[in-house]
Amino acid sequence: MTPKKTGAIIFSVRCSRAAARTTQKHWKTRIYSTESARGFCGQTGKVAFMANLSVNYCGVNYRNPLVLASATPGWDGEAMRLAGEAGIGGVIPKTIGPKQDWADHPRNGRMFLHRYNGKPIGQVNMELFSTMTRDVWIDRELEIAKKSGATMHISILAMPDPDDTARLVEDIQNTGMVDLFELNVSCPMPASTVGMHIGKNPSLLKRQIEAGKSVAKVPFTVKLTPNDCDLVEVATVAKEAGADGLTISNSIRSFAGVDIETGHPYLRSYGGYTGPAIRPIIMRKLSEVARNVDIPLSGVGGVGSYRDVVEYIMLGATTVQLCTAVMWNGYGQITKILKDLDAWMDQKGYKSFDEIRGIALKDITTVEKLAEMPPLFAEIDADKCTGCG
């Protein structure tokens, strides 16, 4: 029986095809709706803003600081084009890797959604890298993505052999469609020779960055891991090795949980945790790097509103990436965030994000110094007391 089509985008990638054809009532597939990309902006990609939302990251201009993170919403060129139509400043594809067919993603369970009082707060995924080969991206998908009008920030895999990483940089670079690279050394559920296993090892990280940087003709940024490492130390190594900018950071290595009726795990391996619940963790890591390492930063983790974007910028980020919010709410969420951000900038009278970048960092101190400050005491307003205690 042929499934009924819904107005969704039918991807060429075989493992997303079934998801793209399913009903949009399933939260996981809402990102594929063409309508959702246009839901807030009518003529997509032509939204007029009152404030100047442009930023310059690593010497490259973005029309605004919002960037589609390397994840499911950038599965292929068409998905990236939709994000561009919704107004996004930059697009990053699923991480591009080997020339040969890449292994299928694990399919022994569903992406696991965590809720609190019925409201989604996070999700665990086991997606790896792009299931399309390097040649497919080079021959077709990057050209489609370029039509987004957004800055092309291309995610590439740090291969086990740094020389292969350098060849990957050259292959993608020769398309002429790359504005920046983002080296993925941080996937939380990779094979033992790639992903976070490189990113948490300073010596391996240094070799990878030096190899990629040696052939890159555009800015070369690195997406770091928040897992099992001193991120300030790793960020320092990355800068010294030649990185032009850093993305802080990839998802949190996690476990979905156990079905107590059967005793079996919901997902039988460790995955990456994303969504609003990780934002305080990433804000800490972003602020620590911003206070200690002088390098352009891109913040990512749990971003879903204009307030989140502003917070990340006030903690030192130049661009701010999002993913899960688009998966849950559609590409129209991009335009909503940008409209709200524009209104906030206009209301506050800011002419540029340069006026607010990093302004919160000066007030961050140690627990010991907090203890020296005058204590605060609660005052009870008896007229508003509900007698709850």
Task: List where the protein language model places each region.
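N-terminal capping/small domains of soluble enzymes
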Residues: 46-153, 157-162, 166
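Glycine-rich beta-to-alpha transition loops that act as phosphate-gripper elements at the mouths
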Residues: 73, 155-159, 224-229, 295-307
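Catalytic cores of alpha/beta
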Residues: 79-80, 167-171, 229-240, 303-320
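Glycine-rich phosphate-binding active-site loops on the catalytic face of alpha/beta enzymes
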Residues: 93-98, 185-187, 248-254, 302-303, ...
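Glycine/Thr-rich beta-alpha phosphate-binding loop at enzyme active sites
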Residues: 122-123, 188-203, 234-291, 295
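Alpha-helix-loop-beta-strand connector modules within alpha/beta enzyme cores
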Residues: 134-139, 143-148, 200-220, 267-295, ...
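Ferredoxin-like iron-sulfur electron-transfer modules
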Residues: 368-389
